[in-house]
Amino acid sequence: TERANELQVSWTNPVGAISVEISYLLEGDKPENTAKKNIRIATEKVGSLLIVVSEPGTYIVTAVAVDNYGKRSEELTVTATPLREEEVVRTRFLERADILMTSLMNLCFGKSARDCWNTRYPLATGPYWDGDAVVWDQGAGLSGYVALRGASIGVSAYEKKYADLTDRMFNSINRFITTDNKRSAYAVYPQNGNERYYDDNVWIGLDMAELYEQTKENRFLEKAKMVWDYLMVGNTSSCGGGILWREIPAYSNKHTCSTAPAAVLGCKLYQITKEQKYLDKAKEFYAWLIQYMQDPSDRLFYDNITPSMTIGKSKYSYNSGQPMQAACLLYNITGEQQYLNEAQQIARSAYSKWFTLYDSKELGEKFYRINGDHVWFYSVLFRGFLELYKIDGRRDYVTAFEKSMLQAWMSECRNQTTNLLSNNYFIGKTNSSWQVLHEGAFVEMLARLAVLELEGK
């Protein structure tokens, strides 16, 4: 929990069980010192128990369900490390990201033979579909994990837990690789012949680059480069440049959501490898976005353009977040002031458009808050604001996200039974089901805020 020496244990009550036995033991302690709690099951589907331990350390926690005839289920064992006193104040966001990810994995991950994300909770099923999420949602879950893995580094209560999940997460997303047209890329669903989108791939490529930065393991860099090579196939001469949105079935429009993150990935790969080709393409993609996709009246970005140069003028928050991040990275690499100026212009307009003044009873103050329900879009927008904050130190934008997440956690946005968050909360509603796409985005934002908190920023 957010307090020292406490563990919050949650579980799903199995059908037919009348009680759940929870036992816990400090790792390395004698078995006879095991503490046990027996919890009678009422009508709730999910149970929980707050454990207060006497000393810090890693605890082995075991759960066993018991039915009316005294038959015991197989033991389910996990390890957990409570916060130490000195960690409490500085790990508020990390603790919440961990609670959300733990609940999300328990409820939605590994429910099929693919060992991947189900699309939502309650679990999605159907006569012609096993409920496994499409690759966009799989990628959102991965992004949340990667951000949380990074935030946990150096924090004893969490680091090992998320490092130990690395292989499982890596293998899970790679089950979506297909080899259509003699090239490897992530498909909407496993098996050749399924749709493949360039934007689905670039988000995963960015996660792979971030995993490489965390671990320096070449397997992650190889996948980031695989995605880059795939993006280059979609970088045709039509529409003046840019990257196609979809490969299969064939599609002719170029999109901001495929081209802008490609510029970010190009910058990341250049920073990792120092190979000039990545930087050259990043600059090219960014220039194309400015020339063709940016609205000169407010500096925000349109959605797509056709080969006849007709522009689809819808504006989505993430489509401005990625050019902002690309501009920041290009400024860091080149030192050219125009990139920083443009990033700051985008930031001002994005903040004006996608945030609203809100009077929070939970926080007891007014602040600018997220004003839309597509939380995944906002998580990508946040990446741009964070990159800018690292350069100019202006905290207004980051504070808006910080207070939005604090208020969400403390309000009816957080379901008290599942600990999942309602993406509809920011438009005045709550959810009856929770999509991995948005829950992964919530985890990512909490984790990235945790890094700032841990660094005292």
Task: Give the role of each language-model region.
Residues E74-A80:
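Edge beta-strands of extracellular beta-sandwich domains
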